[in-house]
């Protein structure tokens, strides 16, 4: 029996393949494993796109197969108060938030961890995220070395962008078994072990709200205000159904395809700016249009994994959206709550409300919310 046999791990079981294989791997490593299924959204409709019941059934089937106990918990009130209301406020303000990041911060690694601690007496929690972490020795910890969060081994699936708000204390209490694997290997293990989730497709859409039609869903909570789509010169070229449905750099869904610009320009149209005061969407032609480009950004609501604010200019890389290639940049601290970031090369579609996440090689340093582009 390994040294882990006295350690209890509570695995966040989502009903997906990643958490299923995480539970199996931890069992193989000798841990006492139990599952916890979170319900974080109360359906107020009978639409076909909510899969909570199916996900719970799949999670239960996997736990039965592995011979582990599955607990359930309802965090719907916490999700509404700490994630969804912020999400709506940001959309009202014309920004584009990332609720998955806030969900990880407030629900999966806060409410979940507290419940696992206080009710289930956990030593660790585990999630099916594609990230890795370091394990400092007792001597290193005594000398102040903190665990670091690293990118997942599978660069195509790396989810460190969504977890930058974790502190080193939370990282220390968390295990990420599939972060050491590539996705095809995870599916192969699930298949070999006869887990019902082996071929289940990956979930997309807003964290816990599922793959429902986004505009329809958002329209239930925020009244849409249609307005004009204009060129930077002020020519009206179409109508939008609400600024909240559009994000900077967006090409699809403008319904102005075929509209020619000045001089017969037939380049595709992109969202270049949102004029909140006039409720006007500014559309520009060509992805190299100056309105789409930024030299850098200002960010606030900073979170550093080691909880140490950056005090001097730092050369590193940044992602301003998920799955983006790393952008070389320099962080210039303004104060403990704000930073200025200058890109080595101009970037397109830097979007206020989204997160800027910083890296030194494999290490995720942390990040912040983009306030404005510069």
Curated annotation (Swiss-Prot):
Stretches the record annotates as Interaction with target base in tRNA: 98-100
Sites marked Interaction with tRNA: 129, 354
Disulfide bonds listed in the record: 103-207
SUPFAM superfamilies assigned to the protein according to its UniProt record, in alphabetical order: Adenine nucleotide alpha hydrolases-like
Compartment(s) of residence: Cytoplasm
Start and end residues of each stretch annotated as Interaction with tRNA: 157-159, 321-322
Gene Ontology terms: biological process: tRNA wobble position uridine thiolation
Assigned GO CC terms: cytoplasm
Enzyme class (EC, first level): transferase
Binding site for ATP: 12-19, 38, 128
Organism superkingdom: Bacteria
Entry-linked InterPro entries: MnmA-like, MnmA-like_C, MnmA-like_central, MnmA-like_central_sf, Rossmann-like_a/b/a_fold
Enzyme Commission identifier(s): 2.8.1.13
Pfam families: tRNA_Me_trans, tRNA_Me_trans_C, tRNA_Me_trans_M
Active-site residues annotated for this sequence: 103, 207
Chief location category: cytoplasm
GO molecular function, one term: tRNA binding
Keywords assigned: ATP-binding, Cytoplasm, Disulfide bond, Nucleotide-binding, RNA-binding, Transferase, tRNA processing, tRNA-binding
Reaction(s) catalysed by this chain's protein: S-sulfanyl-L-cysteinyl-[protein] + uridine(34) in tRNA + AH2 + ATP = 2-thiouridine(34) in tRNA + L-cysteinyl-[protein] + A + AMP + diphosphate + H(+)
Family statement drawn from the similarity comment of this UniProt entry: Belongs to the MnmA/TRMU family.
Chain's role: Catalyzes the 2-thiolation of uridine at the wobble position (U34) of tRNA, leading to the formation of s(2)U34.
Entry protein name: tRNA-specific 2-thiouridylase MnmA
Species per Swiss-Prot/TrEMBL record: Aliivibrio fischeri (strain MJ11) (Vibrio fischeri)
């Amino acid at each position: 029996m390994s040294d882990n046999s006295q350690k209890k791990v509570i695995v966040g079981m989502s009903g997906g393949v990643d958490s299923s294989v995480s539970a199996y791997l931890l069992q193989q490593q000798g841990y006492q494993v139990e599952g916890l299924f979170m319900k974080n959204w109360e359906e107020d409709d009978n639409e076909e796109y909510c899969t909570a019941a199916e996900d719970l059934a799949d999670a239960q089937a996997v736990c039965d197969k592995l011979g582990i106990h599955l607990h359930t918990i309802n965090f719907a009130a916490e999700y509404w108060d700490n994630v969804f209301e912020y999400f709506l406020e940001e959309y009202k303000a014309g920004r584009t938030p990332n609720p998955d990041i806030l969900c990880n911060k407030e629900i999966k690694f806060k409410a979940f961890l507290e419940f696992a601690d206080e009710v289930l007496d956990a030593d660790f929690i585990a999630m099916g995220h594609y990230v890795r972490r370091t394990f400092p020795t007792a001597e290193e910890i005594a000398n102040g070395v903190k665990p670091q969060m690293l990118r997942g081994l599978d660069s195509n699936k790396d989810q460190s962008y969504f977890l930058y708000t974790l502190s080193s204390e939370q990282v220390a209490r968390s295990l990420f078994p599939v972060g050491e694997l590539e996705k095809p290997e995870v599916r192969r293990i699930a298949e070999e072990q006869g887990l019902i989730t082996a071929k289940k497709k990956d979930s997309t859409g807003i964290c816990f709200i599922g793959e429902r039609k986004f505009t329809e869903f958002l329209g239930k909570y925020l009244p849409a205000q249609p307005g004009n789509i204009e060129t930077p010169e002020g020519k009206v070229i179409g109508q939008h159904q609400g600024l909240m449905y559009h994000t900077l750099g967006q090409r699809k869904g403008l319904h102005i395809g075929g509209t020619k610009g000045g001089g017969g320009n037939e380049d595709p149209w992109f969202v270049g700016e949102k004029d909140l005061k006039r409720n006007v969407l500014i559309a520009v032609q060509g992805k190299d249009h100056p309105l789409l480009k930024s030299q850098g950004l200002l960010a606030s609501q900073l979170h550093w994994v080691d909880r140490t604010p950056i005090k001097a200019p730092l050369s590193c890389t940044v992602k301003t959206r998920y799955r983006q290639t790393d952008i070389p940049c320099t962080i210039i601290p303004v104060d403990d709550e704000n930073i200025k970031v200058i890109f080595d090369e101009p970037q397109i579609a830097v979007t206020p409300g989204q997160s800027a996440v910083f890296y030194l090689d494999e290490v995720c340093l942390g990040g912040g919310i983009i306030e404005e582009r510069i």
